[in-house]
Amino acid sequence: MSSENCFVAENSSLHPESGQENDATSPHFSTRHEGSFQVPVLCAVMNVVFITILIIALIALSVGQYNCPGQYTFSMPSDSHVSSCSEDWVGYQRKCYFISTVKRSWTSAQNACSEHGATLAVIDSEKDMNFLKRYAGREEHWVGLKKEPGHPWKWSNGKEFNNWFNVTGSDKCVFLKNTEVSSMECEKNLYWICNKPYK
């Protein structure tokens, strides 16, 4: 084949009117088009696999967030059927807690709790105590323990205190913070903590 014929054959796709086959039907170009769909299909499969792995990872992370909670979770216990803590109340150990953001005297705080069907916090267990100390932080919060002259300590729900923890100080009303449980004059204005059982 002469150099002229090669030139014409190579450029035939540029001049289909010259009677030569264009590149769409030329066997010379057919190998270039045979694999053209294989690359996009492979990319699509890889994208689907990547997206699937990404979705699985996101689901695993979101499930892990709920299955690996911190030390204190504020969810209903497994034997409860209905969540019943009001807005701004925190659920823990079958009780709803309200931690105030304003200060009042012990009696005024007890009245505020009563308006919500609660009492100043009654602490029944070491778990409750640790939870409340951690929640209270460095601020002093009234709890529902009070001592009238000549009488034993009593909780705001009327139950007698069994002295399972130590109360420092010699005043009549009890507060707690993260490092201590102590007594103070009842007229002092402090934050307070209410609690009531789940409904």
UniProtKB/Swiss-Prot annotation:
Residues 1-40 are cytoplasmic. SUPFAM superfamilies: C-type lectin-like (SSF56436). It is found in: Cell membrane. Residues 92-195 form the C-type lectin domain. Induction: By antigens, mitogens or activators of PKC on the surface of T and B-lymphocytes. By interaction of IL-2 with the p75 IL-2R on the surface of NK cells. Keywords: Cell membrane, Disulfide bond, Glycoprotein, Lectin, Membrane, Phosphoprotein, Receptor, Signal-anchor, Transmembrane, Transmembrane helix. Glycans are attached at residue 166. It comes from the Eukaryota. The chain crosses the membrane at residues 41-61. GO terms for cellular component: external side of plasma membrane; plasma membrane; protein-containing complex. This is Early activation antigen CD69. The gene is CD69.
